[in-house]
Amino acid sequence: MFPENKMLLIAGPCVIEDNSVFETARRLKEIVAPYASSVHWIFKSSYDKANRSSVHNYRGPGLRLGLQTLAKIKEELDVEILTDVHSPDEAREAAKVCDIIQVPAFLCRQTDLLVTAGETQAIVNIKKGQFLSPWEMQGPIDKVLSTGNNKIILTERGCSFGYNNLVSDMRSIEVLRRFGFPVVFDGTHSVQLPGALHSQSGGQTEFIPVLTRSAIAAGVQGLFIETHPNPSSALSDAASMLSLKDLERLLPAWVQLFTYIQEMDAVSV
């Protein structure tokens, strides 16, 4: 699916807020451009955040307008697109535009959604639920494979640890790798504090650097990073998104470490 010698970077804003998403996508392309030989960038954003903490929180522009926006970004920037889906009907529509359709962590056991996602023959990114052990991902994988589609990505995004907290167990990455599919680490949702702000999730972005480096050292194929020009003003996941400025600052170290780990793995074979 992807060149193994390149680090996957699935990056973009949490949700499509307005036309500013185009400028964010352009800026991301500029940031990644110097690393074209080392990084495979995929743009991500959501047309609907269907599991917001409060009914009053912004969800997005909706399926029709959202997919139109993503299609324009795909055409203008010549970039692959990922978005998340929440029902079989959404999966069918999203696959007409997006190269990768994502099954959200909360929905990673929904059989009809996984099967329909597989039937589209798009690449399917399955995010491991916060409530699942890595071994239990065999079930979701088998549901997609049952359709004849073996284009699967597995994403680790932390596991629930008591109330309003997530932890990242790097052993999970090794377990997921053994399934034989590319493994990605979600460096921004992993620092969420779910429901900590009552009507929305909190976050500890100061831990993004150490967790992303740890995940790369553990052998992930890439990173999933939600990013925004000004996270504090974002309409969703404001407390856990990484600023574009910080992404640009961290990217060189990610690439350098990924390359080093690739070289070490080659020597140890």
Curated annotation (Swiss-Prot):
Pathway field: Carbohydrate biosynthesis; 3-deoxy-D-manno-octulosonate biosynthesis; 3-deoxy-D-manno-octulosonate from D-ribulose 5-phosphate: step 2/3; Bacterial outer membrane biogenesis; lipopolysaccharide biosynthesis
Coiled-coil stretches noted in the UniProt entry, renumbered to this chain: none
Catalysed reactions, semicolon-separated: D-arabinose 5-phosphate + phosphoenolpyruvate + H2O = 3-deoxy-alpha-D-manno-2-octulosonate-8-phosphate + phosphate
Location of this chain's protein in the cell: Cytoplasm
A molecular function (GO) term: 3-deoxy-8-phosphooctulonate synthase activity
InterPro entries per the UniProt record, alphabetical: Aldolase_TIM (IPR013785), DAHP1/KDSA (IPR006218), KDO8P_synthase (IPR006269)
Keywords of this entry: Cytoplasm, Lipopolysaccharide biosynthesis, Transferase
GO cellular component: cytoplasm
EC numbers, comma separated: 2.5.1.55
GO biological process per UniProt: keto-3-deoxy-D-manno-octulosonic acid biosynthetic process
Group of enzyme by EC: transferase
Family indicated by similarity: Belongs to the KdsA family.
PANTHER family for this protein: PHOSPHO-2-DEHYDRO-3-DEOXYHEPTONATE ALDOLASE
Protein name: 2-dehydro-3-deoxyphosphooctonate aldolase
Source species: Chlamydia trachomatis serovar L2 (strain ATCC VR-902B / DSM 19102 / 434/Bu)
Gene (name only): kdsA
